[in-house]
């Protein structure tokens, strides 16, 4: 019953997250934070409604776990964006969250597929999200490094080196948190 309302909450959230990602590219920080925040609030409201309806934390099935993935990705994205102002991070986190939302929408059979007990821990979903963000940031640092090594012409690399360093620092921080 509660999953039948998911599409409403999901569509509203994804539209708001996408608006926030677009606003980040347009240097409209206030709009980016506001729309991403409203999207997170709407999505979290659905998680809370599900929690109250089920009378337990929604962590037992694959579908419920993907809800947490979809929630934590834009949250991690907005945190990184607020600190380092990387315009692409909100687009990336929104895209990943949208993939998990779509899996929940298009594969309803996972809503009842129970996870093994070890994966029902409240630490499992944040752990996976933090690892995904860590690998994404470290991958971006590798791409930036390859660009600087083989394609960048000229001596103006101070800004690019700082970005690469920051991506590495944040990626390793997320990796450490994930452990």
Label each region the model flagged.
Residues 1-179:
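Polytopic transmembrane helical bundles with strong interfacial aromatic enrichment
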């Amino acid at each position: 019953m509660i999953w039948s309302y998911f599409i409403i909450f999901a569509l509203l959230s994804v539209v708001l997250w996408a608006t926030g990602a677009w606003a980040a590219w347009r240097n409209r920080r206030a709009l980016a934070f506001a729309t991403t925040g409203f999207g997170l609030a709407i999505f979290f409201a659905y998680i809370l409604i599900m929690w109250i309806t089920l009378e337990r934390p929604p962590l037992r099935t694959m579908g419920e776990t993907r809800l947490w993935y979809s929630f934590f990705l834009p949250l991690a994205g907005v945190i990184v964006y607020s600190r380092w102002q990387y315009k692409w991070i909100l687009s990336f986190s929104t895209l990943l969250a949208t993939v998990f939302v779509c899996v929940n929408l298009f594969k309803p059979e996972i809503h009842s597929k129970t996870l093994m007990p070890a994966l029902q821990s409240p630490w499992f979903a944040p752990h996976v999200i933090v690892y995904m963000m860590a690998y994404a940031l470290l991958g971006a640092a590798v791409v930036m490094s390859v660009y600087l090594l083989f394609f960048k012409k000229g001596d103006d690399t101070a800004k690019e080196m700082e970005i690469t360093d920051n991506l590495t620092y944040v990626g390793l921080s997320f990796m450490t948190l994930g452990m």
